[in-house]
Regions:
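Conserved short submotifs of the Hanks-type protein kinase catalytic core
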Residues: 57-71
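Conserved C-terminal C-lobe helix
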Residues: 179-193
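Conserved catalytic-loop aspartate of Hanks-type protein kinases
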Residues: 162
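Conserved HxN/HPN-centered segment at the entrance to the catalytic loop
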Residues: 43-52
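Activation segment signature within eukaryotic-like protein kinase domains
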Residues: 85-86
Length: 248
């Protein structure tokens, strides 16, 4: 057993599962993290598989799939690659939200690129079940800079908290491309300080990105065609004017 990380809530080990002949991740978390029981019952292509969850008096022990791959923060990427990752992130978040689970700690370091070329969303230590009646979160977790204001105890979080973190993550991964017109509105709306000014559902972001792609593909050919026509008419007009003057 090899310890690979230590953090405030617990420790992470890389272990060998002799029974199934595979490497696995063992997480020992201080406290009761019942959210992992819900996650164990779910299956999605962009989530690591949870093998088992157990509890002691003061610990939650999780055994999950070991993903061989780098985090997205370690991978230089093109705008096209980042767009693909964002579609996949939207897909897995929509799945989680349909099951009333909020991740609450979305950031590039919690997104791994698997050997199959697809992302995996990891680290659900800050996750919780969405509760409509609650006024504020009971456990204030998340990463500063990625978590929205309401996640620090100002109000109860809902899926718009994940939308905020998705926006910050997208801006970081896109780099200079984030300043392009097609991204500016999307990222601004995702990261609005007031939850009511953000997108309310993940599918709206998927649609906005897709619409931006379509508009980009249609608009630029039209612009270039228009410029070509204007240039053509200008050249034709100049040539005609020259011919007329020559005839005179």
């Amino acid at each position: 057993m090899e310890r690979v990380d230590t953090f405030k809530e617990g420790k992470v080990y890389l272990v060998y599962d002799a029974e199934h002949h595979r490497m696995a991740v063992e997480k020992r978390l201080q406290g009761n993290f019942r959210i992992y029981e819900q996650l164990q019952a779910l299956s999605h292509s962009y989530l690591p598989q949870l093998y088992a969850v157990s509890y002691t008096e003061d610990e939650t022990i999780v055994w999950e799939e070991y993903i061989t791959g780098k985090s997205l923060e370690q991978i230089p990427a093109t705008e096209k690659q980042v767009t693909k990752w964002l579609f996949e992130l939207c897909d897995v978040l929509r799945f989680l939200h349909q099951h009333h689970i909020l991740h609450r700690d979305i950031k590039p370091s919690n997104l791994l690129l698997g050997s199959d070329g697809h992302i995996r969303l990891i680290d659900f230590d800050a996750a919780r079940e969405e509760k409509e009646q609650a006024e504020m979160d009971t456990r204030l977790l998340g990463t500063r800079g990625y978590a929205p204001p309401e996640q620090y105890g100002f109000a109860q979080t809902d899926e718009r908290a994940d939308i905020y973190a998705l926006g910050v993550t997208a801006r970081e991964l896109l780099g200079k491309a984030a300043k392009k017109r097609r991204w500016k509105h999307i990222l601004k709306k995702c990261t609005a300080l007031e939850p009511k000014k953000r997108y309310h559902h993940i599918w709206q972001i998927t649609w906005a990105i897709r619409f931006g792609q379509i508009r980009h593909r249609l608009l630029y050919p039209l612009v270039f065609t228009g410029l070509a026509l204007v240039t053509g008419f200008a050249v034709w007009g100049y040539a005609t004017d020259t011919d007329v003057r020559g005839a005179m």
